[in-house]
Structures are given as structure tokens and as C-alpha cells.
Amino acid sequence: MLDFMDYIQLSFAEATHWNRDNSYSSLNTTAQSILDFSTPERLRVHLSSLSTPHFATSYTLGTVGLLDGSVSYLFSTVPFDNLPSGSASIPLRKISPGYRQVQAPATPIETWGWDSLLDGVSIPGLTNGSRPEPPIPKDEESIKESEAKRKATLLHASLHLPPPSTLYALFLRRISSNMQLSLAVCSTQGPPQSKSAPQASMLTQLSHDTGKYSNEYLFSTDNALFGWRGLWNFGPDPRYTRDVPPPLSLLSAGAEAYYSPISSLIGMSTGLRFTTLPAATEIPPSSSPSSTRTPISTFPYTLTLTLAPIVGSLSTTYSLRASPNLAFSSRFGFNVYSWESEMVAGCELWRRTKKSDSSSDDDLEWARRKMRMHDFGVSLPGSPASPLLEDPARPEGPVSSNAHTEAETSDSVIKLRIDQSWNVRLLWEGRVKELLVSAGVGLGPGSFSLSPSVSSASGSGSAQSGGGPGMSYWRGVGVSVLYSS
């Protein structure tokens, strides 16, 4: 489950129309949301509040052997007037990432109104030679809101205690409609008797997104590390195409490279991603003209392939959403130098307790549509009248008016993960009264070479102190409670 501050930062990206999918760092986000979730450690309590539309605070208290906690503050020039901030109204699918439906690439929206040398210049392929003019504010309140968006800036600081305390700080600013600057600082307090300055490092990241491709330039003061990440989307350029049918699928290729002149560190990786887009799983209304393209009636899925040639690592993932409330994912990794392999499988199941009269047939109708068991213009008996069923897993823009409905229908989610060593992680996240609760457990056998009968009895895991051969043990169990207002 995301922290409250992560939820605010996610809302900031949506409010400023920044496409998080069009980045090489998000290539495996769909599989990672299902396979790489973490379970809480012992007991942890989060108290958060969106005090004003521009300012948020968060306090965390945990017990992991000893008491620890953190204090966080966040300020944004973009107001969050209509953002659900109470733990009773936050959409669970927003704060608990699951199967991520990648959206089609789009041209960055001109909502800030910067002057450009290309304004008024006719570009071949565009129906309109000039960029759309931003709306003119009508009153003083609209002027302030327009000014805030023009200078979209986010400041975040978090102090982790007890000593040695660690300070995290983030400065995020939209330079233009397609560029974003991020400065992240981490400082750790030295030993009590040490007179040296606290260890600190800063990561600078400049992101450039055009819709067709994206570039990220990074520099870290830790060993003077330079980095670059890029992603290219195959298909038509959204900047020069207008009034075309939405694409059904998307193939993206990307790469990253790092170099440190101090430590002579070199890193490189490349990857591919193929995913279905929302248009591939939507069925047009029967009133639509027959001349339009017929979408592919299929289950949404995402395939990725990543390769790190220097270390000889190869990884593939396959994620599938079998219904609006059920998703599966698997990952296979292999190293050509050490012959080590990794196999991980996981799933997530969303549970609804408050349903409408017709919602009991929604999942069955949704699956039948995907398997081409009925025509586009004909509804099955007992199915909703509309041929388009609302997909609760589809990401939306800035939180809309149906956020409260989504929060009511998605009450809890169960996530399960298992790997080739029978390490098992089970996580439950849901809403209890006005609290967001996350409870998880990890299990493991005491030996890697256990017999199948013992492995099935012990359940999962790998060796750790306190677990001898043939003995099962708890890898960890914990509960996290979040309350926000």
C-alpha cells in the first residue's frame, strides 16, 4: 500500500498531466505491482492529513525491535481541492497498486501557457498550424489557479527517527509542458562521537516527454554517477496525427546506461514492452457506424523482455487481467554467467461487498465479451444494457466524481506471490470502518532441498536463523494501519 505522501505525489502527476507510463523506469510496473509487493513489518501506524489544498502532513510510528517513526511534510503549488484525502474516501485501487493498464501515448497538454518560438508556425501533418491557446482566466480565482499550474512545483521532506536519523527531501518542478526537473536529497546523521559532516547525496533528474519518445538524464553526487534512460513508442506520432482511431496495442523499446568516472562503474540494460491498450478491450455501442475498426476482443495483457548484457541477466514477464477483479502475473529470470534462474508467479483478487443489482453478472459478462461469445450489438440475458462495462482497474485522470463509488465497490484486495524456492508472501489490504489496513505474512521452509511433502506442509520460504533443515518458520508478519483526514 502506498504511503499517503506517495498518494499525493501520484495525484500531483495526474493533476499536471504527466504521463508516468511513458518512461523506461515504468517498463515493468505492471508485473512489479503484482509480484514485488512488500508485507508490513510488525505493527506500523500512519496518521496523515491534507491540512489545506496545498499542504499535507504525515506521521508514522512503528515497532520493529525498537520504536521508530518519521515526520513528513509536503507542499504543492497545484491545489488539491477535490482530492479525496480521508482514509474513508480514498479509492483503494489508487493507494494499492495492482494491474496497471498502460494508456496510449498522447501529446503533452498545453495547460501552462509558456511562450514558444514555434507558436504560429505551420507544421506538416497538423490540422491546425498553431498550438491551442490556454483558456483565459475569467476571475481572480482562475488567475491564481492558472498561475499555480504554470509554476507547478512540489516540495517534500521526510525525517526518519530515531538516531541515526535520515532526512529525505524532494524538489519537483514542471519546467514546461514536456519537461520536468526533480532533485532528491538524502542525508544520514553520522555516529554520535563523529565530528565529520553528515553523509549526503543528491540525485538530479531531468525528464523530457514528447508522447512519441521520452528521455531522462540523471546525475548523482554519489560517485559522480551519470545516467540516461530512453523509451521509444512504435506507431504514429501523437504530435502530428489527429482524428485517427485509437491504437489497439503498443510496442515500446527502451534502454538505460550509467557511468561513474570515479569508481569506473558501467551499467546498461535494454527492454521491450508489448501491451494491449484500452481500445483493444472495448466494444463500441451498437449505434456506432460499421465502418469503424472492430476492436480486438481479448483479455488485457502485458509482455516485457529486459536484458542486462554486462551482467548477463535476462528477464521476461507476462501479466494478464482475467476479469476486472482478478489479475495474474509471472516472471522468469536467467543469468547466462552463473546459470542461476528465477521463477515468480503471483495474483491479485479484488473483493466487492457493496454491489448493484446487476453487478453479480458483470464479471461473467466481461469474460464472455473477451471470448467473442456474443455479437457487438447484442447483450446476453441478464447482462447490463450498456455494451461497455465499467472497468474499475482502468486508471483515470485527476480524481473524478466517481471516486467515491470506486471506493465503495473496491473494499479489499488479496495478493499472493510464490517463487521457485517456495517463498510465499500473502497480503491483504482493505478498509475497516474509516481505516485503511494492510496485513501480510511471509512463510518459508528451513531448507532448500526439502522433499515435496515437507515443502507443501511448511508452505514456503528460504533458510534463515532459527530454522533448521526440515523445519518451517515465519519469515515475518505485520499489520499497517493508515488514517488520514
From Swiss-Prot:
Location of the protein in the cell: Mitochondrion outer membrane
Chain's gene name: mdm10
GO CC annotations on file: ERMES complex; SAM complex
Biased composition (Low complexity): 450-463
Entry keyword Cell inner membrane: no
Name this polypeptide is given: Mitochondrial distribution and morphology protein 10
Known role: Component of the ERMES/MDM complex, which serves as a molecular tether to connect the endoplasmic reticulum and mitochondria. Components of this complex are involved in the control of mitochondrial shape and protein biogenesis and may function in phospholipid exchange. mdm10 is involved in the late assembly steps of the general translocase of the mitochondrial outer membrane (TOM complex). Functions in the tom40-specific route of the assembly of outer membrane beta-barrel proteins, including the association of tom40 with the receptor tom22 and small TOM proteins.
Family the UniProt entry places it in: Belongs to the MDM10 family.
Start-end of Basic and acidic residues biased regions: 136-145
Keywords: Membrane, Mitochondrion, Mitochondrion outer membrane, Transmembrane, Transmembrane beta strand
InterPro entries in the record: Mdm10
Assembly behavior: Component of the ER-mitochondria encounter structure (ERMES) or MDM complex, composed of mmm1, mdm10, mdm12 and mdm34. Associates with the mitochondrial outer membrane sorting assembly machinery SAM(core) complex.
Gene Ontology terms describing biological process: establishment of mitochondrion localization; mitochondrial genome maintenance; mitochondrial outer membrane translocase complex assembly; mitochondrion-endoplasmic reticulum membrane tethering; phospholipid transport; protein insertion into mitochondrial outer membrane
Description of its domains: Lacks alpha-helical transmembrane segments, suggesting that it resides in the membrane via beta-sheet conformations similar to those predicted for other outer membrane proteins and porin.
Region (Disordered) residue spans: 126-145, 384-407, 450-469
Pfam families xrefs: MDM10
Membrane topology term: Multi-pass membrane protein
Organism: Penicillium rubens (strain ATCC 28089 / DSM 1075 / NRRL 1951 / Wisconsin 54-1255) (Penicillium chrysogenum)
Location, primary (coarse class): mitochondrion
